[in-house]
């Protein structure tokens, strides 16, 4: 199975690159989207419990500061349904970016209800609620897998060793371009400081509006 092979490759890369990652990575590729001075960047795993705990804070920061939340796929090899959930996220992205964002938020909100066996069924119900469907083969050409792999490889170059890894990024020359959020209780203070250093504003006239995900009721776990 392709997914199993990919997970084995990921595990091997973790083992081989561990020493290099411990020495830090290249964060130069992490920048705010066009039109924004400041953004939040997160490398996350949809099956990671700590990522689910961080999700409300990230969404609150996005709403409070009106800055983009840029998500990167970083499915860990020890999680048995995460990779497929990220593939589904990319599939929903292909329908609309808002739908992909809603799927990720939905997964984190209902993470404890997911299993490897019921993932597809939940995704099909989510799709139906959004007036679309999940085809039998959602990634026949491998394009979504390639996007997930590209994000994972970016995370390795950056030096990601755990999920979530959160950065505040800025294009201001008066502040550090990338600041890692080590203590999430300090994240808002870090954002305040970086926005102040960026001149007190977070976006330019060309910035795209940030949309909030549609809230969905909690799901019930499929009967085993």
Regions from the language model: what does each represent?
Residues 1-9:
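Bacterial N-terminal signal peptides that target proteins for export
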Residues 8-18:
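Bacterial N-terminal signal peptides
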Residues 23-38:
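A short beta-strand-turn-helix
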Residues 25-29, 55-57, 151-154:
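A generic local structural motif
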Residues 32-35, 62-64, 81, 157-162:
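Extracellular/periplasmic catalytic domains that process cell-envelope and extracellular macromolecules
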Residues 38, 67, 164:
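Residue-level detector of short, conserved catalytic/binding motifs and their immediate flanks
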Residues 41, 46, 52-128:
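Structural alpha/beta surface segment adjacent to cysteine/selenocysteine redox centers
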Residues 124-224:
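C-terminal cap of thioredoxin/glutaredoxin-like
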